[in-house]
């Protein structure tokens, strides 16, 4: 589904929070939305790999990697598995890699930077905890809407129809 975040902000000014502009789009889909599954980790992609192995049910995986650009938390293998398992997208407050391959995948992917060095995979991190970055607090099951203009957050699904 295509979203217009500007229009959603106009229609629901009291229901949405705007995430500060900090992300670059790396995936093949520039507009996406859904409810959140949250991972908090630092330079470790193990919990990400475990989580995207399950059916995403059209949800968005939000990764709080502390904004680190030293090691990529998302690579082509992770993104492809997420796409195959019905994840709507991945929003990574951290780095990604294999950018050319990511652009070819039919999934939304946002990250703060790209770097060729991959993260370790030890499984250290937290699943479905509140996280705060970009001027907002994200809670599990909140709803995120993304297009080329920006990223907005709502505690409830917005009536788009």
From Swiss-Prot:
Alphabetized UniProt keyword annotations: Cytoplasm
PANTHER family assigned: 4-HYDROXY-4-METHYL-2-OXOGLUTARATE ALDOLASE 3-RELATED, REGULATOR OF RIBONUCLEASE ACTIVITY A
Residues spanning the signal sequence: none
Compartments in which it is found: Cytoplasm
GO CC field: cytoplasm
Subunit structure: Homotrimer. Binds to both RNA-binding sites in the C-terminal region of Rne and to RhlB.
Protein's UniProt name: Regulator of ribonuclease activity A
Molecular-function annotations in GO: endoribonuclease inhibitor activity; enzyme binding
Organism per entry: Idiomarina loihiensis (strain ATCC BAA-735 / DSM 15497 / L2-TR)
Function: Globally modulates RNA abundance by binding to RNase E (Rne) and regulating its endonucleolytic activity. Can modulate Rne action in a substrate-dependent manner by altering the composition of the degradosome. Modulates RNA-binding and helicase activities of the degradosome.
Family per similarity comment: Belongs to the RraA family.
One Pfam family hit: RraA-like
Disulfide bonds: none
GO BP terms in the entry: regulation of RNA metabolic process
Main location: cytoplasm
């Amino acid at each position: 589904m295509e979203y217009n975040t500007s229009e959603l902000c106009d229609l629901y000014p009291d229901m949405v929070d705007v995430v500060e502009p900090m992300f670059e789009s790396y995936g093949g889909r520039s507009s996406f939305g859904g409810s959140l599954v949250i991972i908090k980790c630092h330079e470790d992609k193990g919990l990400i790999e475990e989580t995207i192995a399950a059916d995403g049910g059209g949800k968005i995986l939000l990764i709080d990697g502390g904004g680190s650009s030293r090691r990529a938390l998302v690579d082509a293998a992770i993104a492809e598995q997420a796409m195959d398992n019905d994840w709507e997208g991945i929003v990574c407050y951290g780095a990604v890699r294999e950018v050319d391959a990511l652009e070819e995948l039919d999934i939304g992917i946002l990250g703060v930077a790209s770097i060729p060095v991959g993260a370790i995979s030890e499984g250290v991190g937290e699943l479905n905890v509140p996280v705060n970055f970009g001027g907002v607090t994200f809670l599990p099951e909140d709803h995120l809407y993304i297009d080329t203009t920006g990223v907005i957050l709502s505690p409830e699904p917005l009536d788009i129809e």
